[in-house]
Curated annotation (Swiss-Prot):
The gene is rpsS. InterPro entries: Ribosomal_uS19 (IPR002222), Ribosomal_uS19_bac-type (IPR005732), Ribosomal_uS19_CS (IPR020934), Ribosomal_uS19_SF (IPR023575). This is Small ribosomal subunit protein uS19. Pfam families: Ribosomal_S19. The lineage of its organism: Bacteria, Bacillati, Bacillota, Clostridia, Peptostreptococcales. One of its GO terms (cellular component) is small ribosomal subunit.
Length: 93
C-alpha cells in the first residue's frame, strides 16, 4: 500500500539538509545514511549516498531513473549464493 498523497513523500530531514548544503557548495562527497526508507528526490541526482544494509554501507550513485524510489531498494540486505549443483548429480545415480 502506498503512502497518502496528502502526506507527501518521506525523506529523513538530516539527509535532505546535507544534500541541500552540498548542492549550494557544489560538492560531491559520499553521504552515509541509515535511512533506507527515504524517497529519492531530484535534488539527489549526481550524489553518491552510502546506504546501510545491516552490516556495511553500500555506495549508491543516484541517477535520474531512481527518482521516486526508496534508497533501500538499491542496497540489498541478503546475499544469494545460488543453489548447490552437486545434489542434482548425486540423486540421479
Amino acid at each position: 500500500m502506498s503512502r497518502s498523497l496528502k502526506k507527501g513523500p518521506f525523506i529523513h530531514q538530516g539527509l535532505l539538509k546535507k544534500i541541500e548544503e552540498m548542492n549550494a557548495k557544489n560538492e560531491k562527497k559520499v553521504i552515509k545514511t541509515w535511512s533506507r526508507a527515504s524517497t529519492i528526490f531530484p535534488q539527489m541526482i549526481g550524489h553518491t549516498i552510502a546506504v546501510h544494509d545491516g552490516r556495511k554501507h553500500v555506495p549508491v550513485y543516484v541517477t535520474e531513473d531512481m527518482v521516486g524510489h526508496k534508497l533501500g531498494e538499491f542496497a540489498l540486505t541478503r546475499t544469494y549464493r545460488g543453489h548447490d549443483d552437486n545434489e542434482k548429480t548425486t540423486k540421479r545415480k
